[in-house]
Amino acid sequence: MSDAAVDTSSEITTKDLKEKKEVVEEAENGRDAPANGNAENEENGEQEADNEVDEEEEEGGEEEEEEEEGDGEEEDGDEDEEAESATGKRAAEDDEDDDVDTKKQKTDEDD
C-alpha cells in the first residue's frame, strides 16, 4: 500500500512541475496562462494553432515589424526589398558591435 501512496504523490509532483514549466514558457512568450492554470485542458487544435503562429512569428517577426513601420509608404508589395533592408540593418548593427569590441581589444593590448 505504501508504494501506491508514493506513486500518487510523485504523479502530483510531476503534474505540478509540468504546469509550472508551461506557465513559465507562456510568460516568456508573452502569453497568459489559462484561467484554470491547466494548459493540458486546452483543445489540441488550439494548442497546435498557437504553436504554428509562434513559429511564423519567430521566422518572419522582423519583416512584420518593418511592414508596420512603413504603413502606407510602400504598398506595391515589394517584400523582397523590405527583407533586404531588414537584413542590411542587422548587418550594420553587427558591424557597430564589432567596432566596439575591436576598440576594447586594442585598449587591453596597450595595458
Curated annotation (Swiss-Prot):
Coiled-coil zones: none
S-S pairs: none
MF (Gene Ontology): DNA-binding transcription factor binding; histone binding; histone chaperone activity
Biased composition (Basic and acidic residues): 13-31, 101-111
Entry-annotated residues carrying N-acetylserine: S2
Domain of life of the organism encoding this protein: Eukaryota
Residues that bear Phosphoserine: S2, S9, S10
A Gene Ontology cellular-component term: cytosol
A GO biological-process term: positive regulation of transcription by RNA polymerase II
Entries under InterPro entries matching the protein: Pro/parathymosin
Modified residues (N-acetylmethionine): M1
Record field: compositional bias (Acidic residues): 40-84
Residue list for modification N6-acetyllysine: K15, K103
Quaternary data: Interacts with NUPR1; regulates apoptotic process.
The family this protein is said to belong to: Belongs to the pro/parathymosin family.
Task performed by this protein: Prothymosin alpha may mediate immune function by conferring resistance to certain opportunistic infections.
Entry protein name: Prothymosin alpha
Encoding gene per record: PTMA
